[in-house]
Curated annotation (Swiss-Prot):
Zn(2+) 2 binds at E148, D182, H217, E262. InterPro entries: AP_endonuc_2, AP_endonuc_F2_Zn_BS, Xyl_isomerase-like_sf, Xyl_isomerase-like_TIM-brl. One of its GO terms (molecular function) is deoxyribonuclease IV (phage-T4-induced) activity. Belongs to the AP endonuclease 2 family. Binds 3 Zn(2+) ions. It holds the Pfam family AP_endonuc_2. Keywords: DNA damage, DNA repair, Endonuclease, Hydrolase, Metal-binding, Nuclease, Zinc. The gene is nfo. PROSITE patterns: AP_NUCLEASE_F2_2, AP_NUCLEASE_F2_4. This is Probable endonuclease 4. It catalyses: Endonucleolytic cleavage to 5'-phosphooligonucleotide end-products. Coiled coil: none annotated. Its EC number is 3.1.21.2.
Length: 284
């Protein structure tokens, strides 16, 4: 097996250099961050002029693909036209910021929660998400957008592989859209990763295609199968458990993807310890 590309979701406080130092401290070879506040305001810590230099540093240090996380506030499936227009405009701006990193030779994706239909129905919600992405891609196609697998709470779209496939099929520029596989969300949505790992992967391949999966959010689950709760647990301390993560990091397809921890930092060393734990599960 090759070395895992793995890290956590990091703070951007202090800018690009501080972001990379945090990754070094936890022993990471991949990481995620918000390009602006999770609530939508532009982050002043990240200077677009320095993005290319940052990308070149990552490339030189052999980092795996970055998996930047779009703010939670974006809702491409919403009924509020002003908020939806903001999400489209802001996502395009985020992609433009990240394009300089990719052009420096460093692979980078932007991950989004597909959206919540807020009572309009799943069909309408999925159509709105596809239309929103089409508008984004009319402005910029510099970075691939990854749709995150969702746990299915509330009116979330993307609660199963078929809904994600519907959204992707509605996007004109299909080469510019992929998927982030969130381990907690997939279990919570009703896919039995613990007892039927191979079966779940077959369903994913049939609905979307494994080649479209570009990143993994590595989280254990507090509540487990079909709970639709979306509550992350630390690695090995939830309903997925160490046997599942052993299977994941030894899967010849999935283990090649950047793995991002979104688990709670119980101590300053939590993510370093989890990175070491997961690397230790790889069979030599």
């Amino acid at each position: 097996m090759t070395e895992l590309y793995i890290g956590s979701h990091l703070s951007t406080a202090g800018g690009w250099n501080a972001l990379l130092e945090r990754s070094h401290e936890e022993g990471g070879t991949a990481f995620a961050f918000f390009p602006r506040s999770p609530y939508g305001k532009r982050s002043k810590a990240l200077d677009p002029a320095d993005a290319a230099t940052f990308g070149a540093r990552l490339k030189a240090e052999d980092y795996g693909p970055l998996v930047v996380h779009a703010p939670y506030v974006y809702n491409l499936a919403g009924k509020d036209e002003a908020k939806r227009a903001f999400a489209i405009e802001a996502l395009a701006e985020d992609i433009e910021l990240l394009t300089a990193i990719r052009e420096a030779g460093q692979e980078v994706y932007i991950n989004i929660h597909p959206g919540a239909h807020v009572g309009q129905g799943t069909k309408t919600g999925c159509q709105l998400i596809s239309e929103g992405l089409n508008q984004v891609f009319e402005r910029t196609t510099g970075v691939m957008v990854l749709l995150e697998t969702m746990a299915g709470k509330g009116t979330e779209c993307g609660r199963n592989f078929e809904e994600l496939a519907t959204i992707m099929n509605g996007v004109k520029n299909k080469a510019n859209v992929g998927v982030t596989f969130d381990t907690c969300h997939v279990l919570d949505a009703g896919y039995d990763l613990v007892n039927d790992y191979d079966g779940v992967m077959r369903q994913l391949d049939e609905a979307i295609g494994l080649a479209k999966v570009k990143a993994i959010h590595v989280n254990d689950s507090q509540f487990g199968l079909d709970s639709h709760k979306d509550r992350h647990a630390n690695i090995g301390q939830g309903q997925l458990g160490i046997p599942f993560f052993t299977r994941l990091v030894n899967d010849p397809i999935m283990a090649k993807l950047p793995m991002i921890l979104e688990t709670k930092e119980q101590t300053p060393a939590t993510h370093r310890d989890e990175i070491e734990l997961l690397r230790g599960l790889v069979q030599k």
